[in-house]
UniProtKB/Swiss-Prot annotation:
InterPro entries: US22-like. The gene is US23. This is Tegument protein US23. Belongs to the herpesviridae US22 family. GO terms for cellular component: viral tegument.
Length: 592
């Protein structure tokens, strides 16, 4: 495999390393789906699913990845560790969970039982409950994801000693670090001995990144973007990390990649505290992703509880957010908050892949998921895009789609269309045309009957007077000045309306409430006030700096402190931390 030849040179990838390129083979996919077929078809009822679990006790089901992980079917009534646990307080939203059994690991020719309990929620969501930490881990969003990727997203897998290490090379450096991984001071000294060495930091299912070992925080000046930061800003970044951890800590190294110019581009920092708990510091923001996957510069959260877990899981907790626990416990451990999987209920498996007419036909869904043309060896990502294309091809090209129109009963004189394969053509109903209007119909308003005779007589008198004037042959009378309407008066209505509107605006201005200040006067700034504001801001920054320096020195020099006390500090003090500290890691202007 290429990652075992790291000393000969790292491979070059032309694609982004954020996608998950690893998945199971088609044979493994079918084996997992076949083992969980009974559970998949019983998901419509919780009682039926519980009966299935009771009827298949001690049956072993494959979990895909890792290849030696299995599920031993067992009801929840046989597990005493679940009797006093309220899982509704842990999960983000209320959801009914049904216990399926415990996870076991095949070692040589026998099974070793773990404490991990597998539960199923709505839509075949699978959760792992870890009693020692009282947390819920989202194992898979649905059964199809479990068959494709197994348990690679589950962080509890990497806490088991049977799980192999993903980070192995260079062998001498990794072996030396693991030897001193339980003592913080000894581990920091070991990192100093191998200062500048590159470790092939591998995450299961992801492409490898380079972990450059660094002795102290000041050595970051050799890496981008810290080499452009002044000494004061670098010290502020160090103080911010100390104020987040609330104890003494050490730097393990910087995670990133080498650029064409030869410089090392840093994306993350890996640090560990005095209790050998490992954390990640985000340096490069990732805002072009969905909200559950966004990462902001300056965020600090726990990556692993030990160095062994770190070299097994890598940056898995950076890429996924699937841990659910109590809020105080999450704040004490600096864990990343898990995303809510109940917001997109419309994106469930049977809504995205199947027709609405078969959304409860689980047997048909199972056959569709296990079809033979779903897997191809050249597919590097997953099958989601090909599933959408398959639906389009099956429904449009082949005509294999469900008829959801209600059958129409034939009326009198109607016959079924023979050219439509026995299906009745829909009848297009049109609105009736408007009624024709009679020619003799009078469209104008007719006056009242009482005034009809008066109007008729007046019209007759006018006609007679006009005939007399024509017979007399007199010259037409010129109009008087008072009878002439000038053009200005013809537009008088419009001008009057405009004048009234202008007068109305003036009256509104006069009726405005006095606000107590002059707008024109306030537009002129007093330079003394501006200088005073900047002086106050400078004094506040100076006070914040001195206060942070005193707190950091106190944390560094304390001799003994328990982990519980440090966690209590994080719960009580991190909420009042000034947001100005996190801005020290904002290097967006230095990233392209």
């Amino acid at each position: 495999m290429w990652r075992t030849r790291w000393e000969d040179g790292a491979p070059t990838f032309t694609r982004n390393d954020e996608f998950l390129y690893c998945h199971t083979r088609y044979e493994t996919f079918l084996r997992v789906m076949g083992d969980f077929q009974g559970i998949f078809e019983c998901q419509y009822s919780a009682d039926v699913l519980r009966d299935w679990v009771r009827n298949h006790v001690d049956q072993v089901l494959s979990l895909g990845i890792p290849h030696n992980w299995f599920l031993q079917v067992r009801p929840g009534s046989t597990m005493p560790e679940l009797r006093d646990q309220l899982l509704d307080d842990v999960i983000c939203c209320p959801e009914r969970l049904i216990v399926l059994g415990k996870c076991v690991i095949m070692v040589e020719d026998h099974y070793e039982e773990t404490e991990l309990v597998l539960c199923m929620g709505g839509g075949t969501r699978l959760y792992i409950y870890e009693p020692s930490q009282e947390i819920l881990l989202l194992c898979a969003r649905h059964l199809d994801e479990l068959a494709r990727y197994g348990m690679m997203y589950t962080e509890a897998v990497y806490r088991q000693p049977q799980t192999p290490f993903a980070t192995r090379v260079p062998h001498d450096v990794v072996a030396m670090l693991l030897r001193h991984g339980h003592d913080a001071d000894a581990l920091a000294a070991c990192v100093g001995e191998h200062h500048g060495r590159d470790v092939n930091f591998h995450t299961p299912g992801r492409h490898a990144k380079t972990l450059k070992l660094l002795t102290s925080f000041g050595c970051l000046t050799d890496c981008w973007p810290f080499e452009v930061a002044p000494a004061a800003r670098l010290a502020e970044c160090e103080m911010y990390v100390t104020l987040q951890l609330r104890c003494r800590w050490y730097l393990l190294g910087a995670v990133g990649s080498y650029r064409a110019g030869g410089f090392f581009d840093t994306s993350f920092l890996i640090i560990f505290d005095r209790f050998c708990r490992f954390y990640v510091v985000i340096v490069k923001s990732h805002l072009d992703r969905s909200p559950p996957l966004q990462r902001l510069a300056g965020e600090i959260y726990r990556l692993a509880d030990s160095l062994e877990e770190l070299f097994r899981a890598g940056l898995m907790k950076v890429y996924v957010r699937r841990r659910y626990e109590h809020g105080l416990r999450r704040a004490a451990r600096l864990e990343r908050n898990g995303g809510c999987v109940h917001m997109g209920e419309a994106a469930r498996l049977h809504f995205t892949m199947f027709d609405s007419g078969v959304d409860r036909d689980y047997a048909r869904q199972f056959r569709w998921l296990c079809r033979g043309d779903r897997f191809r060896a050249e597919m590097l990502n997953n099958w989601d895009g090909w599933d959408a294309f398959t639906i389009w091809q099956a429904r449009v090209v082949r005509g294999d789609f469900a008829e959801r129109r209600r059958p129409r009963s034939l009326g009198d004189g109607e016959e079924e269309d023979e050219g439509n394969d026995g299906r009745a053509m829909p009848v297009v109903r049109r609105r009736p045309p408007p009624m024709p209007r009679d020619d003799d119909e009078d469209n104008h308003v007719v006056p009242d009957n009482q005034n009809l005779e008066v109007i008729h007589d007046a019209l007759a008198d006018d006609e007679e007077q006009g005939e007399d004037d024509d017979d007399s042959g007199a010259e037409p009378m010129e109009p008087e000045e008072n009878n002439v309407v000038p053009n200005v008066e013809r537009r008088g209505g419009e001008d009057a309306v405009a004048a009234r509107m202008a007068a109305g605006h003036e009256s509104d201005d006069d009726e405005w409430e006095d606000l107590g200040f002059d707008l024109e006067e306030d537009t002129v700034f007093d330079l003394k006030d501006v200088d005073e504001w900047f002086e106050q801001r400078r004094l506040a920054e100076k006070e914040r700096w001195h206060l942070g320096q005193r707190i950091v020195n106190a944390y560094r020099t304390e001799a003994e402190v328990s982990e519980a006390e440090v966690e209590a500090r994080r719960i009580n003090l991190n909420t009042d931390l000034s947001p100005e500290w996190v801005k020290s890691f904002d290097f967006r202007e230095h990233f392209v």
